[in-house]
């Protein structure tokens, strides 16, 4: 169980999350839509230090070594090729199979990772994340910039992760979460505006539209 207790995150004078509390069961795919979703994932990974509140996994502070994170705008060290990045991933994750992932999310192996177009950089970041055996995986705007085929393949991979018992958080537009999550949350006004089971998508859309955050 990931427990987020009274989390507050500010960006200058803006309050992104204001005393937000969530309880996310382990071994499930959780969708996060609405305002402040990227800030939440960044706090879970430790890129953002909350102004207040705490985050725990199984009753203990959530550690970065337990978490894998794919940023919305992935960045790579200059000079490293795609092959170099994959070799490093395999070195740290023996037994992982990048070839199987690349068949679903293809990236040119000899290209410089940092110089890839945006969609290919995103595919590489997702491949590297999905090779990661960590207990919790965070995907921030994973569908942004992907072509239709890649988005379909990614949806299948997320479903596979769920069937394997991984704990996955997907931050995306509400429409992109339908059919891939065990449950999903709509954020707004600094907190959770609604929590929905996977079969309640239509109700989530109606309520999000009524509050003006359906497309955020």
Language-model region placement:
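Helix-to-loop junction immediately C-terminal to a conserved catalytic motif
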Residues: 45
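Helical segment within the ABC ATPase nucleotide-binding domain
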Residues: 151-164
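Catalytic Walker B motif of ABC-type/P-loop ATPase nucleotide-binding domains
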Residues: 137-141
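Conserved beta-strand-loop-alpha-helix hinge in the C-terminal portion
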Residues: 191-213
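Conserved ABC transporter NBD signature motif
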Residues: 50-65
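Q-loop/switch helix immediately C-terminal to the Walker
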Residues: 73, 78-94
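Conserved structural motif at the start of ABC-family nucleotide-binding domains
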Residues: 2, 17-19
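Hydrophobic anchor residue at the start of the ABC signature
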Residues: 125-126
């Amino acid at each position: 169980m990931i427990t987020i207790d009274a989390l507050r995150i500010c960006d200058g004078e803006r309050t992104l999350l204001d005393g937000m509390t969530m309880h996310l069961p382990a071994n499930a795919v959780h969708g996060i839509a609405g305002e402040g979703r990227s800030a939440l994932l960044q706090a879970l990974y430790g890129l953002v230090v909350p102004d207040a509140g705490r985050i725990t996994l199984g009753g203990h502070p959530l550690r970065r070594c337990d978490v894998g994170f794919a940023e919305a705008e992935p960045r790579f060290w200059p000079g490293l090729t795609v092959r170099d990045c994959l070799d490093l991933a395999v070195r740290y994750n023996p037994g992982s199979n990048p070839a199987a992932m690349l068949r679903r999310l293809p990236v040119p192996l000899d290209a410089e990772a940092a110089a890839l177009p945006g969609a290919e950089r995103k595919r590489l970041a997702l491949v590297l994340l999905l090779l990661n055996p960590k207990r919790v995986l965070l995907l921030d705007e994973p569908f942004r910039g992907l072509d239709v085929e890649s988005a379909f393949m990614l949806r299948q991979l997320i479903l596979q992760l769920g069937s394997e018992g991984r704990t996955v958080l997907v931050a995306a537009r509400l429409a992109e979460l339908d059919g891939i999550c065990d449950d999903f949350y709509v954020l707004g006004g600094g907190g959770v505006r609604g929590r929905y089971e996977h079969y309640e998508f239509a109700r989530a859309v109606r309520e999000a539209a009524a509050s003006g955050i359906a497309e955020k």
